[in-house]
């Protein structure tokens, strides 16, 4: 951290004039973010209907050659809601939704929201055992599947608890051409054709604690956890990000390539558009070479990001038209301090609304003051406490209380659990309780353990430092080390594995690395078979980039925990270990042994991970 990143009073005061001009919207957003009224109708469906009432003919969603007004989009969602109700689905039910980024996904989620049905947003990268787990975990009453993911579902369908009520959206503009559903599926686009386009009365029956959707996060016990994201949390994000932080108008267009099974795309970007009835522009996938062409084509004024996205854009060759765009605001998380200022200057960006939040957490930060190199400011009760990495626990004083860090110091981020900042928890009560620290500063208090190391930089601002424990972030995704270990240990030829994240220079997050003990010598091992197995069982971002071969028993602590800190420090550096190391280079289909020349290339940026 640079001392220049510490926030001072003069810096705060210098931002006041800009904030004053946006004060009404920020006050409104702040009130929404603190709502505790359990009797007031709110949430996604209510917000869409409000946006439709104030800007019915404005563009709500743009995708490829399709442009839907708020009136058209709302009517579509209403037909979906009407049909789902007609087949007996109701408030409190769950529907599994497995569709890639396109309007059909968004209309489905809103249709469910208007009925009080919870949409389980399946990670579209999941396959095999992980997909089975995520699906069965939430006990869905129906599934809505895009054509692009039917094969993934069919591979595991025999192991799914749901045996009927599978619905289908063709991979095309289904409002124009519904297509034909495969055997075993009903074509939802055809089924809803004659349903009511009017707002259902049930929209006004969604309240603070009603579930809106499940978002899956990496589980410390291995497989993903389904996090309940209720209408109240969505409302708070809608106010906190949409009105207070991002502050887009009805003529703004925010572009996102981020997957909608994550909260940054589904909640932050979309809520920022809905707040003042602006437009959401969707891309199916991220393309570094085509990104700015899309921005210009759709006249976008904002975009959503994760750190990897910005790095890829920054690594593109500079062009004379880099500033030929209308972007004034970007919103997301993980923009690296090393490129922050250069990125803004190169592309002519005024505001970086860096944020910090998690799908399950109760504490959030956003860069409302537009400082550099910070996740911003938080109005809610939080604490950054001293943390012992060796013992893997917070430090407590002689009275048994945790100790807050001083300004400039890093520690573990905790969010106080109160009526205004509840922790909604997971589907598993035991997992919920494990995420809570009690008696932190006084008897009876309760705080959510974010698992993140943060630095206090003053005036309620913080910097993200690192992710602790059994997950790490790579390619904009959270990776569960336990999940990857369980998959590795299931491969013939691997006796034991320990997985951790390691830093590669000039990349965001940490790449997966596994120390493995094999049943044969590393020269005889079937690396081709391992790669094929991992591609079948894991999303691409979770496949380890490096393998460290260990022919001895794994080193553990007295409580039989693997000693990962030493492994993380040594990472793939051949000078720090005698172990053979193998690497899966970008574009390659199999691991190869790492040598000094290849390591120098990796460290020097010759390979694009």
Describe the residue ranges of each PLM region:
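Structural core segment of the AMP-binding/adenylate-forming
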Residues: 2-16, 86-87, 110, 114-191, ...
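Conserved AMP-binding/adenylate-forming core of the ANL superfamily
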Residues: 36-41, 45, 49, 57-102, ...
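Conserved AMP-binding A3 loop
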Residues: 69-71, 212-236
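AMP-binding/adenylate-forming catalytic core of the ANL superfamily
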Residues: 126-133, 143-146, 303, 357, ...
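Conserved pre-ATP/AMP-binding loop-to-beta segment of ANL
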Residues: 168-170, 190-216, 223, 246-253
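Conserved AMP-binding/adenylation subdomain of ANL enzymes
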Residues: 235-253, 261-301, 316
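Gly/Ser/Thr-rich phosphate-binding loop
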Residues: 275, 297-305, 314-388, 422
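Conserved C-terminal "lid"/linker of ANL adenylate-forming enzymes
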Residues: 498-504, 513-517, 531-609
């Amino acid at each position: 951290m640079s001392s220049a990143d510490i926030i001072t009073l003069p810096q705060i005061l210098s931002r006041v004039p800009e904030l004053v001009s946006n004060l009404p919207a920020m006050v409104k957003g702040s009130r929404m973010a603190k709502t505790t009224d359990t009797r007031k109708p709110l949430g996604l469906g209510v917000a869409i209907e409000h946006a439709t009432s104030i800007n019915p003919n404005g563009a709500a969603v743009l995708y490829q050659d399709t442009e839907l007004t708020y009136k058209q989009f709302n009517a579509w969602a209403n037909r979906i809601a009407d049909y789902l109700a007609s087949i007996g689905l109701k408030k409190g039910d769950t529907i599994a939704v497995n569709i890639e980024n396109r309007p059909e996904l968004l209309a489905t989620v809103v249709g469910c929201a208007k009925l009080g049905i919870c949409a389980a947003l399946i990670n579209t990268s999941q396959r095999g055992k992980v997909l089975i787990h995520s699906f069965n975990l939430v006990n869905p009453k129906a599934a809505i599947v895009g054509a692009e993911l039917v094969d993934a579902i069919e591979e595991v369908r025999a192991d799914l608890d749901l045996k009927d009520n599978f619905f289908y959206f063709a991979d095309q503009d289904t409002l124009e051409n519904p297509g034909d559903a495969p055997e075993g599926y009903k074509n939802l686009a055809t089924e809803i054709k004659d349903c009511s386009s009017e707002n259902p009365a049930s929209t006004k029956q969604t309240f603070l604690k009603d579930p809106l959707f499940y978002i899956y996060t990496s589980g410390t016990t291995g497989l993903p956890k389904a996090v309940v994201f209720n209408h109240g949390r969505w409302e708070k994000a809608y106010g906190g990000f949409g009105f207070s932080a991002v502050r887009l108008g009805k003529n703004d267009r925010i572009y996102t390539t981020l997957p909608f099974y994550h909260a940054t795309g589904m909640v932050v970007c979309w809520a920022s558009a809905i707040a003042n009835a602006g437009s959401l522009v969707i891309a199916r996938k991220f393309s570094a070479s085509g990104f700015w062409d899309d921005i210009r084509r759709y006249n976008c004024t904002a975009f959503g990001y994760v750190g990897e996205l910005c790095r890829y854009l920054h690594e593109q060759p500079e062009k004379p038209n880099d500033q030929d765009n209308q972007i004034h605001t970007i919103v997301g998380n993980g923009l690296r301090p090393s490129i922050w200022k250069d990125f803004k200057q190169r592309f002519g960006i005024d505001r970086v609304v860096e944020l910090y939040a998690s799908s399950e957490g109760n504490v959030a930060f956003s860069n409302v003051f537009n400082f550099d190199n910070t996740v911003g400011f938080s109005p809610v009760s939080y604490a950054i406490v001293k943390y012992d990495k060796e013992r893997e626990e917070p430090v407590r004083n002689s009275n048994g209380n945790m100790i807050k860090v001083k300004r400039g110091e890093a520690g573990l981020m905790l969010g106080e659990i109160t009526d205004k900042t509840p922790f909604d928890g997971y589907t598993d009560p035991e997992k919920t309780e494990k995420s809570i620290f009690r008696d932190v500063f006084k008897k009876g208090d309760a705080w959510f353990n974010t698992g993140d190391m943060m630095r206090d930089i003053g005036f309620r601002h913080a910097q993200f430092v690192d992710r602790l424990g059994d997950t790490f972030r790579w390619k904009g995704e959270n990776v569960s080390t336990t999940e990857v270990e369980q998959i590795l240990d299931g491969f013939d030829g691997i006796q034991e594995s320990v997985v951790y994240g390691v830093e590669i220079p000039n990349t965001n997050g940490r790449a997966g690395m596994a120390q493995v003990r094999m049943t044969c010598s590393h020269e005889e091992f079937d690396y081709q078979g391992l790669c094929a197995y991992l591609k079948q069982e894991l999303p691409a971002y979770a496949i380890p980039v490096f393998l460290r071969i260990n022919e001895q028993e794994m080193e553990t602590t007295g409580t039989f925990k693997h000693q990962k800190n030493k492994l993380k420090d040594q990472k793939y550096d051949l000078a720090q270990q005698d172990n053979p190391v193998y690497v899966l280079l970008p574009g390659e289909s199999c691991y190869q042994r790492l040598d000094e020349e290849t390591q120098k290339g990796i460290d020097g940026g010759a390979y694009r991970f």
